[in-house]
Amino acid sequence: RFLCISPWNFPVAILIGQISAALSCGNKVIAKPSEHTSILGYLVVRKFHECGVPLSALELILGDGLYGDMLTKINSLQGVAFTGSLPTAKKIQSNLIENQNQIVPLIAETGGINSMLVDSVHY
């Protein structure tokens, strides 16, 4: 299984991208959205199921970071896609090293400093 952990600040786009990439490579997926965007995570996964992705190919786990921590300790993971903070990415990497009997890919996008410009044109 491939674990996809998405952030609160881009809850739909990033989760869809992570799930789509993992499924298209033939992986079963565990989706774990941020605890702040559980409803959106549920709706994204439900839409995948409505489009024909089998329940057995895409599972949803809801909860806070403790659930994410436990999921990264599953010793049968084939990979992890994570978007979030650098400290959390380092914890995931540590869990993967400690709990896997093989090298497991970690795709971590961290740091996400996004700027937004607002000017009078938008009012």
Question: Where does each model-flagged region fall?
Answer:
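Rossmann-like NAD(P) dinucleotide-binding subdomain of oxidoreductase/dehydrogenase enzymes
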Residues: 1-123
